[in-house]
């Protein structure tokens, strides 16, 4: 991990320079790292390993948006895991899932079995808070981070983390407030 001892800004700068040189020269490089951001920024393809066994191979986008397991989803970035059971299909090809007593639509990546419980992967940046739609939730953390607002909410007994970008023009929810966790059905990956 050649960049591990550098400060954060220099690490990002050097990572960018390595990628630029790699693309300019057209070389193949193997880069071993535990920093997921380095893997995403420097790779055309990523190999995720778990206990010495290959867990998934793919492009950064494939692995991030379509992980094949909870391990891969959690390893490659922040991920929320919601348990939901399949209720029915809709006319537009979506799946209605029951999560903590609420029903939501998701875009499944394959056939789902009625009544079967699935794990839904939701990335923090793919969710927002609002007054309507989605799932009922309660805010347990609200933290301004500059370019985004960091929230932790409880959906029933499940903690969900989300990051809303550009909070300047959005309503900021306070700890204890009840609201709705909303997301695009295409943003949810069903395992």
Task: Identify the residue ranges that each predicted region occupies.
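Generic alpha-helical hydrophobic packing signal
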Residues: 19-22, 45, 54, 60, ...
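Glycine-centered loop/turn positions within well-structured domains
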Residues: 37, 61, 70, 82, ...
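ABC ATPase nucleotide-binding domains
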Residues: 1-71
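Non-catalytic connector elements of ABC transporters
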Residues: 79, 89-191
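Small-residue-enriched segments and motifs
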Residues: 16, 70, 84, 137-140
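ABC transporter nucleotide-binding domain
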Residues: 59-94, 115
